[in-house]
Amino acid sequence: MQKKSNSLRDVIVVGFALFSMFFGAGNVVFPPYLGMEAGPQWLAGFSAYFIADIGLALLGMFALLRVGSSEAVISRVGKVPAELLMCAIILCIGPMVAIPRTSATTFEMAISPNLSGVSPVLFSVLFFALILVLCIKESAVVDIVGKILTPLLLLGLFAIIIKGVITPVGEISALPQISNVAVTGIKAGYQTMDALAALPFGIIVLQSVTAKGYDNSKKQFRVVGGSAILAGVLLLAVYMGLAYLGATVSGQYNGAIGRAQLVMAIVEALMGKVGMILFGVVVGLACVTTAIALTSSAAAYFAELCRGKVPYKAFVIAICVFSAVVSNLGLDRIVAVAAPVLDVIYPPTLVLIFISLLMPRMPDRVSRGACIGALITSVLCTLTAHGVNIPVVPSLPLYDLGLSWLIPAAVFGLAASLLPLRARSREKRIVPLPNEEH
């Protein structure tokens, strides 16, 4: 009986920790903006967003549990391609996109609305100087602040959502502002990068659960799986509420307003100036804790990749300097620059997640073939989306849903499975499942 009680408690504790990892304060800007753009179709747009965000992130978590490590998921494509893909993932959830976004979000939601004279360059220098000090010292204060801020942020968000449902700021517009809410929702889900983060986050959670005494794979699956579902339900409630709030102002605002500005306008309309200040402060502090976690994780990964030849502290400094420069692009420009990169690396990553989850014993050559098909298609679609005329691309199946890479991935994977026996004989590895009985 005591054991069950402890298991339930651990599921709740780990679930809340996972929520805070996936949510990240920077992700608060995407659902309201999608809701505003989708207007009367906000629920359809949100459904696509949630599937591409938390749905895929949960699949990534379960795939990790299925095969036992992120290396087992990624290494199917071969050592060098796997390292390149993992580097791309870490760069996206690190210094290229996610870390600079924490600074830009803090400036636009906490500083700019209340202290209009502050230079964004000066702020970014101060912000990352703080991150640098806390990451190098690995201060325990960060953990304490994070545990306090996550519940505060959650309470603040639910207070705003409930008030916005009871007394909406405005009426939902008659027509959407965008032509394809499903594709826009999927791309907004990609921007959160939660599915990419599921692999490194999953390792952290798995290590935490193991440290709590769950050394049996079935028990680990139960605790981590329960925690992932709890985090998913919390994120569903928060993101859906925020998307609805965005829809309620779809008659007042359009794409000319920035993402952070839209959130703060909604908060001010619902909670007043004082509420806007308090919300901005909480979001800003939460961004600090997110930046610390991402910076330390990215620095640790690259230090390990270099096998200690370049120390952890050197990577922390490099990441902070680079992120400070990128953060001055501003939140919306960071999102715009990140979009094509994410559109390219998401499909092959998702292919590996699907294979690890559903067909973990599939030979590596098939995984490589499927990833090549997904990668080629995603590159062509991204080029088309940015003005390059490739006539065949819009005719691809599922193109209108943003999933045109699915069938090419399956075709290339099937073709790889039909390779001659000599090529097959060079296969060296089939990933053993950690929960198999021996």
Task: Give residue spans per PLM region.
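Helix-loop-helix connectors at the membrane interface of multi-pass transporters/channels
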Residues: 34, 102-119, 210-211, 291-318
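TM-loop-TM module centered on a large, flexible mid-protein loop between adjacent transmembrane helices
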Residues: 70-75, 238-288, 304, 340-342
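C-terminal membrane-solvent junction of multi-pass transporters and transport-like membrane proteins
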Residues: 350-414, 425-438
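Membrane-interface loop-to-helix entry segments
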Residues: 136-164, 338-350, 369-375
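Membrane helical hairpin/interfacial module
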Residues: 35-129, 136-137
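Hydrophobic, membrane-embedded alpha-helices of multi-pass small-molecule transporters
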Residues: 13-23, 161-169, 178-245, 278-287, ...
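Membrane-water interface regions at transmembrane-helix termini and the short interhelical loops
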Residues: 36, 65-72, 128-149, 211-214, ...
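Selective recognition of specific alpha-helical transmembrane segments in multi-pass small-molecule
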Residues: 55, 59, 152-163, 226-250, ...
